[in-house]
Each structure stands twice: as structure tokens, then as C-alpha cells.
């Protein structure tokens, strides 16, 4: 009996020893992972990335700028390798999933959430949160599960905005589930972050573009409105609740934004908004906006003052919608508000609102009958000049959320661009969209300069390849109108990456490598750009180049929906594909374009007849002057050219 007991005791001790050893190894692995240090380093590297980009904005001599940029690019390579290694270690630890403790998942959630607020790196956030989500689902830790689903939904929504629209419906599932839980339990939240997330969820769920996409009923929309009202009253009327004032203020602002968005939503489609409940709801918000106008008329603080003016603008829109104002009355009122607000000393915080006011005023200007076309054009040109000023200022405001959406909305709004000729509309796209991002604009201009020489040789030596384009059917006509061919190709080169501007948060991401999903998503810049370039017949001429410049000579490549082989502009598309490839500065990571110029030349020669037009490749390699000049532009002169581009891009308004 004693022997049995002794043996059993030894067995227990051996098990305990093994357990202690295992616990020790787990603790050691956790300490080695050191999430605090890793995320602190990731944050510093991200900020260093931005800081080094910001240094490019400064006025400095050319040689100094080139030296700084060379150091920057080398530093970014080091940072990227360092961050990739740290992220691999984090993923490997949580991917194992064995005996990871609750507090370790809590730490991951906290660190990722903080990092997302700073960087808006949606892909990395979604990937890392996906390792914590199953744990909270299994353990029924509902508040942490709520936070996970909230962050996941917000990150997926951002991914959807960059072009992967199918992700929005995944995001919607997470956000609705989190919002439903948050509304039921917000009085019991233990963490301040949870209050921050619930307000952000309402803010996102009630954005007008998502209201329209989901085609919600008025009842569903109004139910969410009532929920937000309850939350706002409780957060701002509970003296025992000690919360960051910014969270309370955001909730109150979101409450206003919700009212604003609902009114915009109701006014967007007259045909569906004739029912009695809708009219009653419109009347309610009409009265509320009148009250808000009175309440906020004496506010002078910039952000609140902008809110009051936004409410007042919508008030005049509602007056017209309900038949109480003529288009002229609403236009004059909105224009007056806009003119007073644009004189604000610091317009950066209200730039998005100002662009929105121009869009609203342009609508009433277009439909009013009291003004002559000359008077309308005078207002429109004034607005255009203001927009150019705002976009210049925006170049020094890094990644202002929503700015690109607002610029794209006004550029593609027929009530705004109807006043302008083809050249003016081209100016709109160049200054308001293409110039909204420095790196993409720099790449487009480099492609343009390389392409100009390519087109010059093509016209001179092989004009027959261009016969039949632009209405000129003979070689003689092509030679006689070479300026038109140059201009056409110049516009095609400038606009070819138009769709990348929406994706600039991803294309400008240098502190880590892109995932395969991100590389795949970047291909969406082709249909996105094609949709924007199709705003009118003038720009639609460049549709084939915008959507087809990654299509191969043999018909392969992407997108599948575009048939390059049968395109009437095939020779232009083929020439642009070669020019874009040789520049190589902003090509898609998934395409594996080598950084070394000689390596690119090797690929160009090897893939003639499959990826590249063999006749154009032969023309390029057999023309010594073109070959030499292109090498200069792509190598030793490239940094000098980039300096000139950045100088024009940023410094034109630094002295103002």
C-alpha cells in the first residue's frame, strides 16, 4: 500500500514538474515576444516613415534633397525588414493557439486597437484581430468580443472603401452584431475603449453611402437614430461616468451627423419618399435643424462653428426639398454661408465641409433659371479656383480621412462639371484627384516624360502603327498632327493610375511589406479609375489606357473583363504598358517589377511577344537615342526629376 502511494506521489510530482517546466517555457516565450516593445517599435517606425515623407515637403537645395531621399529609401528598406520580422513573431505566437492565457489575448487586442487608431492600417489590424476573435467567442467574454467585432468591422469597412466592396458586407455583419450588443449593455461597460467603439460604430453605420448601399427602410434607420439618442443622453447626462471628454463630444457630434445623414438620405430619392411616415420624419428634422440653427448661431470655435454652418446649409436644402424655397433662394443662402466660412484662418479642419458646400451650391446654381449661363460660369470658375487652393493646402495635411471621397464626388458630379469645357475638366481631374497624392502623381509624371520620347520615335519611325486613331487614317495625316498624338498620350500617361489615389493609404505604406491580399486588392485601381475617367465623352477617350495598362500583349494580364487584343487603342495601351514598366516606381508589388533598371530591360526583351508588343520592343532597343535617353530618365536623372515634381507639388504654396 505504501509502495503504491509512494509511486502515485512520484507520479504526481513528475506531472507537476512537467507542468512547471511547461509554464516556465510559456512564460519565457511570452516575455521573449514582448508585445509592448514590438508595438512601440512598430509605432516609431510608422511615425518615422511619415516624418521622412514630410521632410520631402521642405524647401531645400536639390543636392540636399536627393541625399535625404536616398537615405530615406535605404532606411525604409531596413525598417520594412525589421517590422516584417516582428510581425512574423507576433503571428507565429498567436497562430499556435496552444495554452495562450486570456490576459495575453487582452494585451493583443489592446495593442492592436491603439495601433489602428494611430495608423489606420486596416489590413494589419484585421489580420491580427482575427487571432483573438475565436478565443473571446469560445470564452464568452462579451465585452472583449464586442471590442474585437467593432475593430474588425471598422477595419473591414476601410478596406471596402479602398476598393474591395465585398468586404463591406462582412464588415456590416460584425458592426451590426457589435452595435446590437453595445446598445443593450453600454451601461455595464467596464472599459473606456468600449464607449469609444460604440460611438464610432454608429458614426460608420450611418454614413449616407452605406445607408444607400444597404437600402435600409425608414423604420430601420429611425430605430438606430433612437438608439443613438439614448446613448447620447446617457453619456452626457451621467455625472458618475468619468469619460474622456472627446468621447462624449464625439457621441454628441455623431448624433448631429446622424440627423444630417438621414435628411440627406431622405432627400436623395424623391420617388420613394412620399409616404406619410417619411414626410413626418422630414418635418421633425426640419424643425430640429431650425432649432439647431438658433442654438449654434453664436458659436465661434472652428469645429463647432462648422457644424452649425453645416446644419444651416442643410436647413436651406430642406426648405427647397419641401417646396418652401426656390432653387435661387437656396443657392444664395448656401453660397453666402460658404463665402463667410472660407475666410476662416485655418481651413484644414473644415476643408471637407467647404468642398461639400461647393457641391451643394453647384446643384442649386445648375437648376436655377434666374441666372444666365455667363453668371453661372462666373460662380463655377470661382469655385474651381477655391478647390485648387484647398487641394494645395491639403497636400500638407497627411491622409485626411474622407478628403479624397469628397474630391472625387465633386469632380464626378455633373451639376458641377457641366459648366466646364474639356480642358477645364481635365484640369479638374489633374488638380483635384491625381494631385491628391504626391507619390502617385510623381510616378504618373515620370511615365509621362518617358512616354513623350517613346511617342516621338513612334510617330517619326512607325506612323503606320498609329493610322486609324484620332480620326487620322494615313501616315501622312499622323505626321501632320503629331501634336495631337503627343497630347493624347500625355493625358493617357497622366491619368493611367487614377484609381490608385483612392488606395493611397495602402500604396504609401512603406513600414512593412504588403500582404498577398493587399497586392491583389491593388488591382482594383483599374476599374475604379475607369469609372472616374468615364464622367464624360472627353475623358472616356482614355478609358482603355486606364483600365488596360496592365493587360499583356497576348491578352493575358488583368482585368479579365477588358479585351486589349480588340481595343481600337491597342497600340497606345501597349506603349503605355512598356513605359509604365520601365519607370517601375509605383508598379504593383504583385507584378514583381525589379528595382534595377537593367533587370527591367532584360525582362522587357525576354517577354517581347507575350507580355510586351514585339514591334515596340524592337523599336526601343534599335533606337540608340531613345534607349540612351530612357536610361538617363530612369536612373541618374530620376531623382532630379522627382525633386522637380515634389518642388512643384509642395513648394508652390509654402511661400503663401
Model-based region annotation:
Residues 247-250, 467-493, 533-577, 591-595, ...:
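Histidine/acidic-rich helix-loop-helix segments that form or flank divalent-metal centers
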Amino acid at each position: 500500500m505504501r509502495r503504491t502511494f509512494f509511486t502515485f506521489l512520484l507520479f504526481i510530482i513528475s506531472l507537476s514538474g512537467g507542468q512547471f517546466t511547461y509554464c516556465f517555457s510559456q512564460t519565457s516565450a511570452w516575455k521573449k515576444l514582448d508585445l509592448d516593445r514590438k508595438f512601440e517599435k512598430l509605432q516609431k517606425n510608422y511615425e518615422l516613415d511619415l516624418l521622412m515623407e514630410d521632410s520631402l515637403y521642405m524647401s531645400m537645395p536639390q543636392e540636399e534633397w536627393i541625399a535625404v531621399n536616398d537615405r530615406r529609401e535605404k532606411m525604409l528598406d531596413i525598417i520594412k525588414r525589421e517590422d516584417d520580422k516582428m510581425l512574423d513573431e507576433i503571428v507565429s505566437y498567436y497562430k499556435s493557439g496552444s495554452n495562450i492565457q486570456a490576459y495575453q489575448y487582452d494585451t493583443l487586442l489592446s495593442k492592436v486597437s491603439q495601433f489602428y487608431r494611430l495608423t489606420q492600417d486596416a489590413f494589419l489590424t484585421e489580420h491580427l484581430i482575427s487571432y483573438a476573435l475565436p478565443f473571446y467567442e469560445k470564452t464568452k467574454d462579451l465585452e472583449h468580443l464586442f471590442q474585437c467585432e467593432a475593430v474588425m468591422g471598422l477595419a473591414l469597412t476601410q478596406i471596402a472603401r479602398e476598393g474591395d466592396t465585398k468586404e463591406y458586407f462582412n464588415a456590416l455583419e460584425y458592426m451590426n452584431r457589435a452595435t446590437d450588443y453595445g446598445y443593450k449593455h453600454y451601461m455595464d461597460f467596464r472599459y473606456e475603449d468600449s464607449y469609444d467603439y460604440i460611438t464610432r460604430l454608429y458614426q460608420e453605420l450611418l454614413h449616407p453611402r452605406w445607408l444607400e448601399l444597404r437600402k435600409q427602410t425608414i423604420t430601420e434607420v429611425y430605430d438606430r437614430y433612437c438608439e443613438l439618442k439614448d446613448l447620447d443622453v446617457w453619456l452626457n447626462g451621467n455625472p458618475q461616468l468619468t469619460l474622456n471628454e472627446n468621447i462624449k463630444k464625439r457621441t454628441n457630434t455623431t448624433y448631429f451627423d446622424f440627423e444630417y445623414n438621414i435628411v440627406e438620405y431622405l432627400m436623395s430619392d424623391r420617388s420613394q419618399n412620399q409616404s406619410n411616415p417619411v414626410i413626418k420624419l422630414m418635418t421633425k428634422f426640419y424643425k430640429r435643424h431650425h432649432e439647431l440653427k438658433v442654438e449654434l448661431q453664436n458659436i465661434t470655435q472652428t469645429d463647432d462653428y462648422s457644424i452649425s454652418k453645416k446644419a444651416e446649409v442643410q436647413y436651406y436644402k430642406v426648405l427647397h426639398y419641401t417646396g418652401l424655397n426656390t432653387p435661387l433662394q437656396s443657392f444664395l443662402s448656401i453660397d453666402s454661408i460658404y463665402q463667410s466660412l472660407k475666410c476662416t484662418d485655418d481651413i484644414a479642419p473644415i476643408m471637407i465641409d467647404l468642398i461639400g458646400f461647393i457641391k451643394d451650391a453647384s446643384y442649386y446654381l445648375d437648376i436655377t433659371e434666374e441666372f444666365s449661363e455667363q453668371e453661372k460660369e462666373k460662380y463655377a470658375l470661382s469655385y474651381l479656383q477655391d478647390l485648387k487652393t484647398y487641394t494645395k493646402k491639403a497636400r500638407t495635411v497627411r491622409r485626411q480621412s474622407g478628403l479624397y471621397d469628397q474630391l472625387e464626388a465633386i469632380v464626378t458630379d455633373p451639376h458641377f462639371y457641366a459648366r466646364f469645357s474639356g480642358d477645364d475638366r481635365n484640369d479638374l481631374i489633374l488638380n483635384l484627384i491625381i494631385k491628391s497624392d504626391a507619390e502617385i502623381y510623381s510616378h504618373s509624371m515620370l511615365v509621362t516624360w518617358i512616354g513623350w520620347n517613346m511617342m516621338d520615335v513612334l510617330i517619326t519611325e512607325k506612323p503606320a502603327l498609329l493610322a486609324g486613331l484620332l480620326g487620322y487614317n494615313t501616315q501622312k495625316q499622323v505626321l501632320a498632327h503629331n501634336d495631337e498624338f503627343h497630347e493624347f498620350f500625355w493625358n493617357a500617361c497622366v491619368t493611367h493610375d487614377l484609381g490608385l489615389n483612392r488606395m493611397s493609404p495602402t500604396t504609401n505604406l512603406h513600414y512593412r511589406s504588403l500582404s498577398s491580399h493587399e497586392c491583389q486588392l491593388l488591382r482594383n485601381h483599374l476599374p475604379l479609375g475607369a469609372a472616374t475617367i468615364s464622367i464624360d465623352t472627353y475623358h472616356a477617350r482614355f478609358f482603355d489606357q486606364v483600365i488596360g495598362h496592365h493587360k499583356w500583349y497576348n491578352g493575358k494580364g488583368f482585368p479579365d473583363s477588358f479585351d486589349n487584343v480588340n481595343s481600337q487603342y491597342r497600340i497606345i495601351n501597349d506603349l503605355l504598358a512598356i513605359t509604365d514598366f520601365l519607370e517601375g516606381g509605383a508598379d504593383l508589388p504583385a507584378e514583381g517589377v525589379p528595382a534595377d533598371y537593367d533587370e527591367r530591360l532584360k525582362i522587357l526583351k525576354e517577354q517581347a511577344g507575350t507580355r510586351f508588343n514585339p514591334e515596340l520592343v524592337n523599336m526601343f532597343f534599335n533606337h540608340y537615342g531613345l534607349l540612351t535617353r530612357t536610361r538617363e530618365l530612369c536612373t541618374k536623372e530620376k531623382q532630379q526629376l522627382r525633386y522637380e515634381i515634389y518642388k512643384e507639388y509642395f513648394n508652390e504654396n509654402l511661400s503663401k
